[in-house]
């Protein structure tokens, strides 16, 4: 039988540092919002969005003014991969918008994304 008393207490105080952000009473510029709806939102749907629905939704997010958009998880399905290809091939990503993808940290998967 294992006994819990063999473990030392695990409390570690936070390091002392100057937290200037915590002392501010206002923000000086607006935050940058990143939409993750195309990835996280799509995973929660019973029937995931089609390629055309994803393209329409991406255009809508751009129209709303998002400057950072997580576009998907291309290694998860062919639809996700084709969606990313369509964004690139159809030049749908505006110059002032940054897109990101979610992926596993595996060489062959990362390399396949680089070559999209």
Predicted segments, located by residue:
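Intrinsic disorder at enzyme termini
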Residues: 1-21
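N-terminal small/glycine-rich loop or linker at the start of catalytic domains
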Residues: 23-46
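Catalytic domains of carbohydrate-active enzymes, especially glycoside hydrolases
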Residues: 56-72
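Glycine-rich, proline-tolerant flexible connector loops at the mouths of alpha/beta enzymes
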Residues: 67-89
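Active-site beta-loop-alpha junctions enriched in small/polar residues
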Residues: 74-76, 102-108
């Amino acid at each position: 039988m294992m006994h819990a008393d063999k473990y030392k207490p695990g409390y570690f105080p936070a390091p002392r540092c100057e937290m200037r952000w915590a002392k501010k009473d206002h923000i000086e510029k607006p935050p940058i919002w990143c939409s993750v709806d195309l990835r996280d939102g799509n995973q929660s749907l019973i029937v995931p969005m089609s390629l055309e629905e994803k393209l329409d939704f991406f255009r809508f997010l751009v129209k709303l003014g998002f400057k950072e958009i997580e576009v998907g998880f291309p290694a998860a399905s062919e639809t996700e991969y084709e969606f990313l290809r369509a964004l690139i091939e159809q030049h749908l990503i505006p110059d002032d918008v940054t897109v990101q993808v979610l992926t596993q940290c595996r060489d062959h998967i990362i390399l396949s994304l680089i070559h999209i």
